[in-house]
């Protein structure tokens, strides 16, 4: 961990859920294909449940919940949400009760199946988006408060200044690893949904005064609102930490193929390509889309010579979309 980042974050409560540094792996075959050195930060190996980026955020979110003496954790997401499942699992591990407020079709596959196997309470609503789901989450919290409980609501994707600290911390880990292997990354690429991972990386890189670009590949609804959301979250995180006038470098590209969860031939072929060339398995909702974006931009020379892709996990989502993926292969 970089000492500057460690010093700034030491005042915030954190519960350790990741007992190791996730590795950075060079991808020689993909590198030859695109004409640049491609590395992957294996945050799919964060160690709890199915792994993934959300666990970094949960270290701070659940640490905050403990300090606030909460006894039940509420979070929101789609029925097949990686975030919702690992939140439920981590919270149960730490002794909390959990309620997942979800939207979508109830099918016993993927993460929803795992929710049920683990005995995590789920409530499924008809909601058009996560903002509407948050209203239901607030209703659940009020119901629990009336019963004398102390609920703690985690927003979609853990995207809050508290949760974003997880990727400020990760930026310090990446900086130290880069120093050890003698690589200064030109770009760090990550799938972007709720925006917390990209925001945290941009803040961490700014604190470290790195020239490395933080690049998000949007996997859902894209537009000026999304860009503003990430920028606002990054600024709020900087203020929360107590660091002013950060020179944030945030870039966001649209590789959603029109909507969140839409599977296309390009995504399916990217999953197969990376799996067969490097033995790394991507998912169809986040990393498959984001890596397709990386390949597209890297081939055009737009990401520099040294590129790091953060594998944010989500393997269980592959099983939810199996039929769609296979229809393109």
Swiss-Prot record:
EC number: 3.5.99.7
InterPro entries referenced in this protein's UniProt entry, alphabetically: ACCD_DCysDesulf, D-Cys_desShydrase, TrpB-like_PALP, TrpB-like_PALP_sf
UniProtKB keywords: Hydrolase, Pyridoxal phosphate
GO molecular function per UniProt: 1-aminocyclopropane-1-carboxylate deaminase activity; D-cysteine desulfhydrase activity
The keyword Ligase is annotated on this UniProt entry: no
Cofactors that this protein relies on: pyridoxal 5'-phosphate
Residues recorded with modification N6-(pyridoxal phosphate)lysine: 54
Transmembrane segments: none
Catalyzed reactions: 1-aminocyclopropane-1-carboxylate + H2O = 2-oxobutanoate + NH4(+)
Keyword match Hydrolase: yes
Top EC class for this record: hydrolase
Family assignment from sequence similarity: Belongs to the ACC deaminase/D-cysteine desulfhydrase family.
Protein name, entry field: Putative 1-aminocyclopropane-1-carboxylate deaminase
Source organism of the structure: Pyrococcus furiosus (strain ATCC 43587 / DSM 3638 / JCM 8422 / Vc1)
């Amino acid at each position: 961990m970089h000492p500057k980042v460690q010093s700034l974050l030491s005042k915030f409560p954190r519960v350790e859920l990741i007992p190791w540094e996730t590795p950075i792996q060079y991808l020689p075959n993909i590198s030859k294909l695109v004409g640049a050195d491609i590395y992957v930060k294996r945050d799919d190996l964060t160690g709890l449940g199915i792994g993934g980026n959300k666990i970094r955020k949960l270290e701070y979110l659940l640490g905050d919940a403990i300090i606030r003496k909460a006894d039940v954790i509420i979070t929101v997401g789609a029925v097949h949400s990686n975030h919702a499942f690992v939140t439920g699992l981590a919270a149960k591990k730490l002794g909390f009760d959990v309620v997942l407020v979800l939207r979508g079709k109830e099918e016993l596959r993927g993460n929803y199946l795992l929710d049920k196997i683990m005995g995590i309470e789920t409530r499924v609503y008809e909601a058009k988006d996560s903002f509407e789901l948050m209203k239901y989450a607030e209703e659940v919290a009020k119901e629990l408060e009336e019963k004398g409980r102390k609920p703690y609501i985690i927003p979609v994707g853990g995207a809050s200044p508290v949760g974003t600290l997880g990727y400020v911390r990760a930026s310090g880990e990446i900086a130290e690893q880069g120093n050890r292997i003698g690589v200064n990354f030109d770009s760090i690429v990550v799938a972007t949904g709720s925006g917390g991972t990209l925001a945290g990386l941009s803040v961490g890189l700014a604190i470290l005064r790195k020239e490395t670009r933080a690049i998000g590949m949007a996997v859902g609804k894209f537009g000026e609102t999304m860009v503003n959301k990430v920028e606002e979250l990054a600024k709020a995180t900087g203020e929360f930490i107590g660091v002013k006038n950060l020179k944030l470098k945030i870039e966001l590209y649209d590789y959603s193929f029109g909507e969140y969860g839409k599977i296309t031939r390009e995504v399916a072929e990217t999953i197969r390509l990376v799996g067969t060339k490097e033995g790394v398995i991507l998912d169809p909702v986040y990393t498959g889309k984001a890596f397709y974006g990386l390949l597209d931009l890297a081939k055009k020379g737009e990401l520099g010579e040294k590129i790091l892709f953060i594998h944010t996990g989500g393997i269980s989502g592959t099983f939810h979309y199996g039929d769609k993926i296979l229809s393109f292969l």
